[in-house]
Amino acid sequence: MADESNTTGVVSPSTRAWLVGLLALLSVICYWVMVSIALNPKLTLVYDVKGARYGGPLVWPSRLLHLAGISAEARMQIFLWLIIVLNAMWLVAIYLVRKDRRKSISIIIAGAFAVFCLLFVFGPMFQSRDVFSYIFFGRSMTVYHANPFLLIPHARPHDIIYPLVGWKFNASVYGPVFNYPSYLITKIAGNDITLNILGFKLLAFISYAACLPIVYWLAKRVSPGRENMALVIAGWSPIMVMHLLGGGHNDALMVALLLGGYLLYRKGWLLSGIAVVMVASMVKIVAVLAVAPMLVMYVRDKQGAPLKRLWKATVVVVGVPVLLYLPFLKSLKIFKTTEHMSTLYSSASIPRLVSYQYQKILRGSGMTAIKAQSVANTRVHLLFLAIFAVVTIILLLSVKDYRSMALAASGIFLVWFVTSSYVLPWYLVMGLMLTAFTGWNFTTGAMLGASVIFSFYRIPEPPGHAVGGPNVWMSVPLILISLVWLVFEGAKRLTAWRAARAGVTAAEALDVALPGD
């Protein structure tokens, strides 16, 4: 295969390498300034540990540019422009390396990612308190010898981590697999809050870093020539850099296991791959969505009887969660918090916007506000659940080979994000990682668009700027992206169906014209 980096284009290979290097350098500078601003505890860009002080290289931009005393309005403007510039450079980098498979480009991408890690891993919690909940769930086991699925933080108000926890009345909503690293980290860190935070951030960093070679390897086989494009999508995404590295979210561990399962499946270890993805779903349950296309592909495989293969897959899909939950399964109450979370609405979700407008109509017809909210939320939940089910079935019907399996999985994650009532920026990680190695397609474009929009999810606002109701700046653009994606995907599938029908008709006509003996 010819080296696509030398194909004729506007930019020569050497110039392209220099441009990618320049984008890497500028991205590092932007993230450095962002982290430096965030270290000022008065600016509320991060969730800090009381009394913590930061120094060294992390604070240099703040001192050099005199950012410590900036106003709240200036903080918002700087942060906004940093996000805009970082997303623009990310998209330009994707375009530049889309057909460039040179190792030198891979090294530049990986080197920049390493610097991003240094900037965020050793800083405070960036725009999220989730790690403080992780610490409490670990301490539930190591300190209180309790079940993290049953013990809520409010039951231990004198615990050292309690003042920092955001969800004080919620037990763990994560799977049993996450309990083990949580136990290990909190056991080692003890009562040292900073060490606990660093432990979970290092777990996120190691997991995130492990994803990149897997994405590169899969891209090399699924979409040859697009390896570096996959690498820059996965490694330079502002959402993933800020929230996986800065926020230390366990989504990194989940997606690392998920990609590991897809890697095993691609290598021919089919049931093992399905089992590992089920383990990923025992970190966060949403990863189970990636199993559906694998099951369709596994059952459709012509090796062996379909029913026998379906039975084997069912044993794995049911057996793995049962075995992993057994040590914690004292009663079905362990799922109470997860059930509660499934009814919540976040401001940026599309269902939140629809429910909000529907409530206005119901209140206008004379219904009380409380009843209108209950009725609207229930009906909107059912509506979007039906939309998710229909589109998912259509996507699963398209699974015919490994690439279409990965595309279906990334499409399902996109539809889940669009139809879910509670969404946060880092929920896009699964879809981004999967679509990264499938090359350029409509789903890749939609995932990139959604991630750019949701990188603006938490712009630090000056006092008095916050407003209630749905976040239309997030949900309306997401609706537009979803509609465009549905139109293009629908047109593509309709064209393919017509072509298949035409092929069948032509084959039937040929059989009539040339009958067999």
Regions found by a protein language model. Give the residues of each.
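Intramembrane catalytic core of multi-pass membrane enzymes that act on lipidic substrates
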Residues: 103-201, 205
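Transmembrane alpha-helices of multi-pass, membrane-embedded glycan-processing enzymes
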Residues: 178, 182-189, 200-214, 254-257, ...
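Membrane-water interface signatures at transmembrane helix termini and the short loops
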Residues: 128, 228-262, 283, 289-292, ...
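Perimembrane helix-loop-helix junctions
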Residues: 289-319
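Aromatic/glycine/proline-enriched transmembrane-helix motif characteristic
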Residues: 86-93, 212, 221, 320-322, ...
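Start-transfer (signal-anchor) and selected internal transmembrane alpha helices
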Residues: 1-32, 63-119, 400-401, 405-407, ...
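Membrane-embedded helix bundles of polyisoprenyl
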Residues: 113-117, 203-206, 218, 222, ...
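Aromatic-enriched
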Residues: 439-517
